[in-house]
Swiss-Prot record:
This is L-tyrosine/L-aspartate decarboxylase. Its EC number is 4.1.1.11, 4.1.1.25. Inhibited by hydroxylamine and O-methylhydroxylamine. Keywords: Decarboxylase, Lyase, Pyridoxal phosphate. Pfam families: Pyridoxal_deC. Thermostable. Retains full tyrosine decarboxylase activity after heating at 100 degrees Celsius for 10 minutes and 42% of its activity after 10 minutes at 110 degrees Celsius. Inactive after 10 minutes at 121 degrees Celsius. Catalyzes the decarboxylation of L-tyrosine to produce tyramine for methanofuran biosynthesis. Can also catalyze the decarboxylation of L-aspartate to produce beta-alanine for coenzyme A (CoA) biosynthesis. Belongs to the group II decarboxylase family. MfnA subfamily. It catalyses: L-tyrosine + H(+) = tyramine + CO2; L-aspartate + H(+) = beta-alanine + CO2.
Length: 396
C-alpha cells in the first residue's frame, strides 16, 4: 500500500496486517540474536509504556509528573555513578548522549575562544580508535577535529599517547570508553581523568553498555590488571549510560549525566513557545516512558536484582568462552564484560553463513573476529546450538 486510501480499514484488519510484518522480525527469546546490545524488556515496563505513552518530555511544563520521574531516574543513575549532584536526561540512546557531551565540549571551546584562551580553529578532541560510530557523526555535524588515539595490546586506549598529545596540542576534550562496543574492554579512565584534570581538559566517558554492568560485577568476574573505575568519583565531566541496553528498559531509553547542573548552560537553547523556555537535549520531542521505565526498573530490581542479572550474563559468557576453547576456536581476549570475540580470518564469510542458518552475530573492526554479546536472553542451550552450528560451518 503506497497511497493512502480514502476510507479507513477496521482495527482487526490493520492489526492482522501488522502482525504479519512483525512475524518477519527476529525475537530475542528465540535465542538467535547474538550480536545485539539490547534484549528483552522487563514485563513491568510494558505496563509503564501504556501509562506514559502520551507524554512528552520535550514540553515538561505539560507533563510535570513525567519530568519528575526523569529527574528521579537521573538521580538513581547518579547514585550508581557516585554522584548525588548529577544533572542529566533520559534521551534516545547512546548516540544522542555522546552528541550532547560533544556539544558541551564545543560550547566550552567557544567560550574559551571568546575570552582569547584558545587559538584552535576547531575543538580538538582525543578519541580512541575503538570509539562508537556516534563520535564520527558528531565530528561531521559539529566540525570537530579529532586526534585518534591508538590502542595497546589489551585493546584499551594508549594513555602515553594521550599524555604526549596533551603536551603537543591544545586539547579541548578526551573521550574514554568503559565497555567498548566490539570487545567490552575498559579504558584506564582513572589515568585519563588524571591527565584531563591536570591540564583543565573536559573528559567524557562512554559507558553506554558498561555503565549498568561494571557497578554490579562480583569480584570473581574481575580480571587482574583491569582498572574497573570509571565514574564521577574520578572527576570526569560526563558519562553516557543506556538503560535500554543492560538496564532492561524499552527503546528509546538512553542516558547522559553531567557532573552538576553547571554544564546545562553549555547545552541550553531558547525554546520560547514551550512551557519551559530553555531546552538542552538534541531531540525536541522526547518520549516520557523512557524516564519512567528507567526509574521503575531501578527501583523494582534494586542493586541485588540487577547484580543477579549481570552475574548470570557473566556466567553464560564464561561458559561460551570455555566452550569455544574446548572446540579449538580462539577468543580474542578473556572476557572483561559479557562480550566475546572469536578470531577468524574469514569472519565476514562466517558471519554470512551463520545468518543463512538463522544465527545473527556481528563482527569487529579492530580485529578480524566475530562478536557475540551475551545478553539476558541468551541461555546455555542457545550457546550450545551456536557452537554446534559454528562447528558445522567450519567443517564445510
Amino acid at each position: 500500500m503506497r497511497n493512502m486510501q480514502e476510507k479507513g480499514v477496521s482495527e482487526k484488519e490493520i492489526l492482522e496486517e501488522l502482525k504479519k510484518y512483525r512475524s518477519l522480525d527476529l525475537k530475542y527469546e528465540d535465542g538467535n540474536i547474538f550480536g545485539s546490545m539490547c534484549s528483552n524488556v522487563l514485563p513491568i515496563t510494558r505496563k509503564i509504556v501504556d501509562i506514559f505513552l502520551e507524554t512528552n518530555l520535550g514540553d515538561p511544563g505539560l507533563f510535570k509528573g513525567t519530568k519528575l520521574l526523569e529527574e528521579k531516574a537521573v538521580a538513581l543513575l547518579g547514585s550508581l555513578l557516585n554522584n548525588k549532584d548529577a544533572y542529566g536526561h533520559i534521551v534516545s540512546g547512546g548516540t544522542e548522549a555522546n552528541l550532547m557531551a560533544l556539544r558541551c565540549i564545543k560550547n566550552i571551546w567557544r567560550e574559551k575562544r571568546r575570552k582569547g584562551l584558545s587559538k584552535n580553529e576547531h575543538p580538538k578532541i582525543i578519541v580512541p580508535i575503538t570509539a562508537h560510530f556516534s563520535f564520527e557523526k558528531g565530528r561531521e555535524m559539529m566540525d570537530l577535529e579529532y586526534i585518534y588515539a591508538p590502542i595497546k595490546e589489551d585493546y584499551t586506549i594508549d594513555e602515553k599517547f594521550v599524555k604526549d598529545a596533551v603536551e603537543d596540542y591544545d586539547v579541548d576534550g578526551i573521550i574514554g570508553i568503559a565497555g567498548t562496543t566490539e570487545l567490552g574492554t575498559i579504558d584506564n579512565i582513572e589515568e585519563l581523568s588524571k591527565i584531563a584534570k591536570e591540564n583543565n581538559i573536559y573528559i567524557h566517558v562512554d559507558a553506554a553498555f558498561g555503565g549498568l554492568v561494571i557497578p554490579f560485577l562480583d569480584d570473581k568476574y574481575k580480571k587482574k590488571g583491569v582498572n574497573y573505575k570509571f565514574d564521577f568519583s574520578l572527576g570526569v565531566d560526563s558519562i553516557t549510560i543506556d538503560p535500554h541496553k543492560m538496564g532492561h528498559c524499552p527503546i528509546p531509553s538512553g542516558g547522559i549525566l553531567f557532573k552538576d547542573i553547571g554544564y546545562k548552560r553549555y547545552l541550553d537553547v531558547d525554546a520560547p513557545y514551550l512551557t519551559e523556555t530553555r531546552q538542552a537535549t538534541i531531540l525536541g520531542t522526547r518520549v516520557g516512558f523512557g524516564g519512567a521505565c528507567t526509574y521503575a526498573v531501578l527501583r523494582y530490581l534494586g542493586r541485588e536484582g540487577q547484580r543477579k542479572i549481570v552475574n548470570e550474563c557473566m556466567e553464560n559468557t564464561l561458559y561460551l568462552y570455555k566452550k569455544l576453547k574446548e572446540n579449538n576456536f580462539k577468543p580474542v581476549i578473556e572476557p572483561i564484560l559479557n562480550i566475546v570475540a572469536i578470531e577468524d580470518e574469514d569472519y565476514k564469510e562466517v558471519c554470512k553463513k551463520l545468518r543463512d542458518r538463522g544465527i545473527y552475530v556481528s563482527v569487529c573492526n579492530c580485529v578480524k573476529a566475530l562478536r557475540i554479546v551475551v545478553m539476558p536472553h541468551i541461555k546455555r542451550e542457545h550457546i550450545d546450538n551456536f557452537i554446534e552450528i559454528l562447528n558445522s560451518i567450519k567443517r564445510d
